[in-house]
Amino acid sequence: MEKLAPTLSNLKFFCRKAQETEPYAKYIIRPVSIYFTWLIVRTPLTANNITFLQIIIGCLGSIALAVPDLFYFAPIYGVLLLQFSYILDCVDGEVARWKKIVSNRGVYLDLVCHTIVISLYMFCFGYGLWCRGYDFALFLGICASFCSFKIDEYAYNKVSNIENSADDIYNSGIIKLLAFYRFPASMNYLSLAVLFDYYMYGGYGIVSYILLIAFGSVVTLGRIAQIINRFYKLQ
């Protein structure tokens, strides 16, 4: 069988997800990521290599959020790097599908990447606001960062001998309100808040702080509610 050429049309047909449930990815990121995929499939780089690069770019973007006084537009560069890391998040899957190297290791690495980047940009977002005089921001950032580590989910799955819990934090009752914390939604809200504040106030402002309050308080309370709910479900 003749090997298909990695043309844009072939890549779009074979590399796109059959069902893309994330509108931002479907209508904005995927149309961009396919061009990066077109370049990368011509190199020896694997999907896992791209995922590692995604982690590095995401961490650099997160750190930029924490140093608003280092240089004026640091948080702006931060959100741009975070958006680029999400492009790479789409690219790694497209490369894996084209090169037929989809694996559990790749999926696992991708999920670990999300956890690392989300927790870091939440903490750095809070630290950056704290550096600009929002005294409670550091505590909120720590709370939001800590809640991104689903320690309770690991413990629950282990004692209940299941791999995937049906009462995931985003799928049960009022906990659905926390969907805005999911990746990439939380990153996009953060990006919009930072861009708005820099446009209106020339730096971190009240919009970013209000968003951090939502991340730090609502998500923390939701996580506590989920832990209690799971505790009483166990025999």
Predicted stretch roles:
Residues 47-105, 140-142, 204-215:
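Membrane-embedded alpha-helical segments that form the functional core of polytopic membrane enzymes
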Residues 1-32, 154-235:
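C-terminal membrane-associated helical module and adjoining short loops/tails
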Residues 42-60, 79, 98-152:
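Multi-pass membrane catalytic core of lipid/isoprenoid biosynthesis enzymes
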Residues 92-97, 124-125, 188-194:
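Generic transmembrane alpha-helix signature in multi-pass membrane proteins
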Residues 33-43:
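Cytosolic juxtamembrane amphipathic/interface segments immediately preceding
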Residues 68-69, 130-131, 196-197:
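Short helix-capping/hinge motifs at transmembrane helix termini and TM-loop junctions
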Residues 56-59, 87, 112-119, 180-186, ...:
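Hydrophobic alpha-helical transmembrane bundles that constitute the permease/transmembrane domains
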Residues 38-39, 59-66, 189-196:
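Alpha-helical transmembrane segments of multipass membrane proteins
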